[in-house]
Amino acid sequence: MDGAENSSSPPHTASEDGCGTFSSSGELGGVVLVESLGSAEKIILRWDSTVSEEARDKMIFSGDRLEVDRYLQAVDHIQNSLRSVSLSSPTPNPDTTTTTTIQIAMARLEDEFRTILLSSSTPVDAESLLVDTPRSNSNSRSSDHFSAAVAAAAEADGSSRGGGSGSGGGGGSFMRSMRLSTSIREIDLIGEDAVADLRSIAERMIAAGYLRECVQVYGSVRKSSVDASFRNLGIEKLSIGDIQRLEWDALENKIRHWIKAAKVCIRTLFASEKRLSELIFEGLSSSSAVTPPLQPLFSLSSPSRSYSFSSSYSEACFLETVKGPAIQLFNFAEAISISRRSPEKLFKILDLHDALADLLPDIDVVFESKAAESIRVQAAEILSRLAEAARGILSEFENAVLREPSKVPVPGGTIHPLTRYVMNYISLISDYKQTLIELIVSKPSSSSNSRYSGELSVPDFDFTELQEDRTTLALHLIWVIVILEFNLEAKSQHYRDTSLAHFFMMNNVHYIVQKIKGTPELREMIGDEYLRKLTGKYRIAATNYQRATWVRVLNCLRDEGLHVKGSFSSGVSKSLLRERFKSFNSIFEEVHRVQATWLVPDTQLREELRISIAEKLLPAYRSFLGRFRSHIESGRHPEQYIKYSWEDLDTAVLDLFEGNPATQHLRRRSQG
C-alpha cells in the first residue's frame, strides 16, 4: 500500500491483485493519482460498509489524508466517466456496475458527512453569549478571520478534495451584507478542517444528484445542535396555547429572558449557522453532474424525491437547520402579541416590541433570501401586532381609569390609590416616549365614542386650548389626567363633610402636579401651560377647604351681634360674648379633633396649609381676645370661656393633618 499502514487503511478484498492495494494508482509529488476506472471502482468497493465489517468500523476522513484523497479522486474519476457517457450519446446508457459503484460511494460519503458533522457540532456556550454587548462592539469576529476561513475552503476546493468535479469555490460570494452589520456576532461553529472536508463531500454528493440526502443529513444534525443551544439558552418548547395559559408574573420573567435569548439566536446562533452553510455549500453546483435522465440512477430514493431549490444550496441547508427553531422562537412573541390585553402588560409588551424592532434589520439580513421570506414576514407581523396591542392597552387603560368603581371614601382625605397608580403608570409611559410617539397616531376624543358606554359620562375637554406642537402621545397623557380628575371629583362626592371633599381634591391634584414635576420626560410632554392649570386647581381646592372649615371658626371672632343698645346704657352683651367664646372653643376643638386625623402626605403642602390657617386664625383670635378679654375676666369663672391663648392655638394647628388622632385634648397651656 502507498503510505504507511494505519488503523484507517481500507480492508483488503478479493478483487485486489498481489501488487498491493493500489496497483492501478500512483503518486506524483505526494499527490495520489487514480489512473483508471477499474482502480477507482476497486477503491470505492473496498469501503463498501454493506459487505465489509472492517469498512463499517472505520471512517475514511478520520484517518490518513492520502486515503481521503484517493477516495475522493476515485469518486471524481467515476463521475467524469459517467459524464463523458452522457455527453457522447443522445441516449446515454451507463454501465450498471459503474452506476452501482457511484451509489455505494454516495452512501459512504453520506455516512462520512454525518459523522464529521456529529463529531464537530457542539451547542453554543450560553453563559458567554447571554451577555448584552453594545451594538457597536458586538461583532467580535473580524472580517479578516472570516476571509481566512473562506480562503481555506476555496483552497480545499482547488485541491484534490474539491477540484475533481469542476465546481467553482465561490469564495468571493461569501462576503454578504451581514458581515457589515455591527450587531452580528458570528462565531465558528465547526473547525476549518472539518468545514473543508464537509465541503468536499457536499460537492460530490450534489454533483451526483444526491442533493436531498446531503441537505437532509446536514439539516438533521445541525438542527439537533441548534435545539441543544436553545436548551442551553433556556428557550422552552411551548405552544402558543401553553404560553397564553401562564400567569402574567411568570410571563414577565420569560419575556425578560426571551429578549436576551432572541438577540443571541438572531445575531449569533442563526447568523453563525448561515455562515457555516455558506462555507460548506456556497458556490457548489450540480452543473457538472450527469444529465437529468441519468440522475435517478444515482439516487438511493425514488425519482419523485428529486430536490429542487429556487435559492442557493447554502440557503436551503441553512433553512433546513433553523426554520423550525426560528418559528419556535417567534411563537413566543406572537403568543404575547395576541394575548388578552390589560394595563399591567403594556410595559413588557413595549420591551418586547422594542427588542423585536431592534432585531428586525438583523432578521432581514440573516433571513434575506426569497425562501426565508415567511420568517421575515412573521417577524414583521408580530411587530405590527405588538404595536397594535400597545395601542389597545393604552385605550383600555384610559377606559379603566374612567370606570374605576370604588365608592368608599379614602380615610383622612389622603391620596387615592387610583391617583398613585395612574400617575406612576403614566410616568412609566414617559420612559417609553420615543416608541409610543411612533405607535400612538390618533388623538383622544373627549366626546362619547365607541370606546365608552353610552351610560358612562365623559368629561369635556377642549384640546384646541393646548399648544399645537403637542404629540398625540402627550394628548393621550393629558386626557388620562383629565379623566382621572373627573373620577376623583365623583369620588369626592362620597364624603359627607364638604370640607373633606375639597381637602381630598387638594391632596390628589397636588400629587398629580408633583409627580409631573418630578418626571422630566412627563413634564416635557404635559407642558408648563397645562401644569399651571393643574396647580391652579389644587390651590382652588385648598382655598375651598379653608373656606368650608375655617370661615365658621372665624365667624365666632366677629364683633357683629355683640354690641347692644338700651335705654340706660350701651355696650357689649356679656351673655352673648360668653356664648361666642363657648362656640369658638367648641368648634375649634371639634376641628382640631377631626382634622388631626386627616392626612397631607406632602410635607411642604402640609406646612403651607398650616401657615395659611395660622395666618388667618391667630391674628383674628388675638384681636378678639384683646378687645373682649376684660369683659369676661370681670365676671365669674373666666377660664370656662377663655380657654386658650393664641399661643395655644398656634401649637394646636401643628397637630393638624398628621393622619393620627390628637395626642391630647386641647387645654390652656399659657395665660396671655
Go through each PLM region and give its residues:
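Non-transmembrane, amphipathic alpha-helical segments
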Residues: 25-32, 36, 56-70, 90-101, ...
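Alpha-helical interaction elements in eukaryotic regulators
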Residues: 29, 36, 67, 71-74, ...
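Flexible helix-coil junctions and inter-repeat linker/turn elements that act as hinges
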Residues: 49, 53, 81-92, 115-122, ...
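Extended alpha-helical solenoid scaffold regions that build the rod-like backbones
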Residues: 243-526, 620-624
